[in-house]
UniProtKB/Swiss-Prot annotation:
The keyword Transmembrane applies. This is Putative uncharacterized protein YPR170W-A. It comes from Saccharomyces cerevisiae (strain ATCC 204508 / S288c) (Baker's yeast). It is found in: Membrane. It comes from the Eukaryota.
Length: 61
């Protein structure tokens, strides 16, 4: 596992898991699903692709 990925997982656990758990406990599944989808689209995906392109680009230079 990449060190950047591990750092991101720790950051995600500390900052987002409490709100995600509270959404699940209130049985608000639509908001929970929206929270997960928006987080993947706007935070995790751009971050992961930028790290991936950086690691791939550094191998060819």
């Amino acid at each position: 596992m990449d060190l950047r990925m591990l750092y991101f997982l720790i950051y995600f656990a500390v900052t987002h898991l409490p709100s995600l758990i509270s959404l699940l406990l209130t049985n608000n599944y639509i908001l929970t699903l929206l929270f997960i989808v928006l987080h993947i689209l706007f935070i995790w995906l751009p971050w992961y692709t930028s790290c991936f392109s950086y690691s791939v680009g550094s191998k060819f230079t």
